[in-house]
Amino acid sequence: MVEEEAKGLPVSKRVWKQEKEPLRANSRVVKNKKLTSWELKKQKRLEEQQYKERLKALKDEKLETKRQQIEAMKLRREKKEEKERYERLAAKMHAKKVERLRRREKRNKALKER
């Protein structure tokens, strides 16, 4: 402490000016610095926010897959119903066609017997 006081006057002779120390970047970094309570709260809040965002993303992804599955099931059901409808329609049409042919044959047979 005594040595610091014995430096003497600055070269510029301006004693009211503060003496500046050289900038050393390494000296500014404090390793293993203990965080203040505010910094701890801030860090904890940030971690909680990131955790919630990840949870939300996972839930959204899960809901999206569920929605896609439901959509696929609906499409499958619609296709199945459409196919069944066409089969019923085809059977009905086939029966109508057979009936028409039978009537024609009866007509032809009746004409031949005359």
UniProtKB/Swiss-Prot annotation:
Transmembrane segments: none
GO cellular component, one term: nucleolus
Keyword rRNA processing found: yes
Keywords assigned by UniProt, alphabetized: Coiled coil, Nucleus, Ribosome biogenesis, rRNA processing
Source organism superkingdom: Eukaryota
Pfam hit, one: Cgr1
Predominant subcellular localization, coarse grouping: nucleus
Coiled coil: 39-100
Subcellular location: Nucleus, Nucleolus
InterPro entries documented for this protein: Cgr1-like
Family membership: Belongs to the CGR1 family.
Known role: Involved in nucleolar integrity and required for processing of the pre-rRNA for the 60S ribosome subunit.
Name the UniProt record assigns to this protein: rRNA-processing protein CGR1
